[in-house]
Each structure stands twice: as structure tokens, then as C-alpha cells.
Curated annotation (Swiss-Prot):
Keywords: ATP-binding, GTP-binding, Nucleotide-binding. The keyword S-adenosyl-L-methionine does not apply. It comes from the Bacteria. HAMAP family: RapZ_like (MF_00636). Disruption phenotype: Cells lacking this gene show a reduction in transformation efficiency and in fraction of cells that express competence. ATP binds at G16, M17, S18, G19, A20, G21, K22, T23. Displays ATPase and GTPase activities. Can also hydrolyze pNPP. May affect the expression of competence via the phosphorylation of a cellular component. This is Nucleotide-binding protein YvcJ.
Amino acid sequence: MSVSESHDIQLVIITGMSGAGKTVAIQSFEDLGYFCVDNLPPSLLPKFLELMKESNSKMSKVALVMDLRGREFFDRLIEALDEMAENPWITPRILFLDAKDSILVTRYKETRRSHPLAATGLPLEGIALERELLEELKGRSQIIYDTSDMKPRDLREKIVKHFATNQGETFTVNVMSFGFKYGIPIDADLVFDVRFLPNPYYIESMRPLTGKDKEVSSYVMKWNETQKFNEKLIDLLSFMLPSYKREGKSQVVIAIGCTGGQHRSVTLAENLADYFKKDYYTHVTHRDIEKRSRK
């Protein structure tokens, strides 16, 4: 389903339960070329849109995250939505992200964060209050996603499919680094083993670092065999990806593995994603980068 172009500004308001995936959502819209604002106070929404209209901005696609922290914010957002309904140059949509209570509690425990509305620190208390506050807004939402069984990549792909303005944006290249010692990713379409490359792990100063650090990536990429492999891999994928897309595949998961998923695979995955992002919607993840604690 494509976004209509019948109005000047296509507006997506991202809201929903805390922990349901709003951060992933706003990042996905940013990758789709939306002008994104996180946590804009509802009282500023009408003025913000007026300023965009008056500035003759070419930013016709806007995505906003609206987090509710109390009844006052909620009431003001409802008023702002009513005001927007009278503006013919705005096409507003509300994307509501939800998840089961048990899943939200688990996510809060994993991140060790407190629910913003939990006065006592108990997640279920905040979740119950938030559901009550958001009930009317959920009823007004045009799009509702239950992210209970979604990984971040699944949510990204769903958003891309729904909001992409052309067919090319619906094909996703997911690049993943991993460590063979933790197993090969079961959802990988293509797996490449880079354990033959020189390993920074054996250099003491680089051991606690990862392939996202400049010192490590420079070391990995300085070798002739790394450069040749990277060149051949890009050449191979440049041939394969258009064929995958032509066959109607919505995404390709490219997994690059080294021993622990910290250095070589991370460097190559970052390079690969950076190269292909000019032609495809590209997302990079490092599955095992947090498995080993830094010292």
C-alpha cells in the first residue's frame, strides 16, 4: 500500500505502548526519507506543521513520535488531531504500536529500564495506566501493529512494505554479523565465512574493541586479502540482489561470520551495508557484538 500524494504533507504520527517499538519505527521512517521528529509535544504539532507549510519545504513526508506522559498530553493531542482534520493540505495517519503485557514486561527487564508511568517502578502498573490513557487514541488509529512476535527487523520490513512510495523501497537488504561459536543464523539466506582474514583479537589493544571502532576496522581492511574479498563479495551481490528483487523476494538476509562476531564480521558487515544503501533499503545488525563484555 503506497502513501497517497494528493496532499502537500503526508503525516504519520507514531504512538502506542512504551516498549512496543517506537524507536525502531522512527528509524525506519527516516530510512524511507521522512522528516522525523522524536517526542514532539502535542501542543506544538499544529504550529510545527504550519511552519513547514509556510517555509515551502520539500519535506512532504513527516513522521512524528508522540509519547504520552500523562492526561494533559493526551487531551492536547486529541485537540491537535481535530484541528488537523480541518486542514486539506495534511494527510494524517496514526500508527499505533502495541504488544502483549507479558512481552512489554520482558522487554523492560531486558533493557533494565523503568516504565515512564510506573510510579512504584513496577512495569505492570505503568502498562495498565498507559493502556487506559491510550484507549481513545488507539480507536482513532488507522494502522495498528501488534509487535509481540516481531523482531526489530520484522517491524522495519512491515513499515517499509506499508509506507514505501515506490516498489524499489519495498526490497530490503539485511546485513548481519555473527560469531560461528554461537551458531549460524537460522534466518540467513546467504552466509559468508571471514575467519580466514587476519584476526584483531590477538592484538591486545584491539581485543576489547569491535569492528565498529576505527582502529579495528582499519586493521581488518588494510590487508590485501580483505580488500580482494570485499571487492569480490560486492561484485557477487551486485549480480545477485537484482535477481532476488526481480523474483519478488521482499528481503535478503546476508550473514557474515567470524569466530566471535566482534571484529572481522562486524567490519565487513558495516562496509557491505554502507555500499548497498545507495541502491536498496539496507539494515545492518550485529547479532553477537554484546555477547562478550568489554574490559
